[in-house]
């Protein structure tokens, strides 16, 4: 089976992006998986922030997850890639007005201070994940949004996984070109061939 989802405030989903948090999006994802996939084995596929949420799911579904495929996953990006790089003026504005329009890597984000604070409750780099899973991360060499060192740090916290970090030579952050998607499909298929039957979640 295959389950794809958008978080609230994304795409055609209900709500506003600025009302969401890492915690609320993680909870929403847990509910959908429990409702739609019951107790099936899972391969998680997460892109950018979705990679962060995917890693959060291990706490609940650790006995069911058999593989994780990250596409430029961005855990803790709110602190490391945003807050830490904001000027004091921007930080004061965000605290006072609760929102800030942030432009980064060709993308525009309406960031709430609540989202920043919530991100601090969802750290993953201070943890160790001792799960014997297949872990594959694809990261574009030309990614201007999430630096490759983030993916390398993720590889380190998954101690017992069968790990693979793939750097796509001309890839950007989205890795949405046909050849990139073909490579993604190939990597998922490689896991699929060893672990049937299960469900893919992305």
Residue ranges of each PLM-predicted region?
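Conserved alpha/beta-hydrolase
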Residues: 1-14
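Catalytic nucleophile-loop/oxyanion-hole region of alpha/beta-hydrolase
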Residues: 11-36
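Gly/Ala-rich beta-loop-alpha elbow adjacent to hydrolase catalytic centers
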Residues: 46-54
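Hydrolase active-site cap/lid region
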Residues: 63-111
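Short beta-strand/loop motif that positions the catalytic acidic residue
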Residues: 131, 137-139, 143
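Short alpha-helix in the alpha/beta-hydrolase fold that links the catalytic acid
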Residues: 133, 147-156, 180
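Acidic catalytic loop of the alpha/beta-hydrolase fold
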Residues: 142-146, 174-175
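Catalytic histidine-centered segment of alpha/beta-hydrolase-like enzymes
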Residues: 171-183
């Amino acid at each position: 089976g295959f389950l794809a989802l958008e978080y609230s405030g994304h795409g055609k989903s209900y709500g506003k992006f600025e009302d969401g948090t890492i915690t609320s999006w993680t909870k929403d994802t847990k509910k959908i998986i429990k409702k739609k996939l019951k107790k099936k084995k899972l391969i998680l596929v997460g892109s950018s922030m979705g990679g962060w949420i995917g890693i959060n799911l291990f706490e609940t579904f650790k006995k069911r997850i058999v593989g994780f495929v990250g596409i430029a996953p961005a855990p803790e990006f709110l602190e490391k890639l945003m807050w830490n790089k904001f000027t004091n003026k921007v930080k004061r504005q965000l605290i006072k007005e609760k929102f800030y329009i942030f432009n980064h890597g060709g993308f525009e984000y309406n960031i709430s201070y609540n989202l920043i604070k919530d991100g601090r409750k969802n750290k993953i780099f201070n943890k160790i994940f001792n799960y014997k899973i297949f872990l594959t991360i694809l990261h574009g060499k030309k990614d201007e949004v999430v630096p490759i060192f983030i993916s390398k740090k993720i590889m380190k916290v998954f101690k017992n996984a069968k790990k693979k970090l793939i750097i796509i030579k001309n890839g950007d952050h989205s890795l949405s070109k046909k050849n990139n998607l073909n490579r993604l499909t190939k990597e998922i298929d490689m896991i699929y061939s060893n672990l049937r039957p299960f469900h893919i979640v992305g």
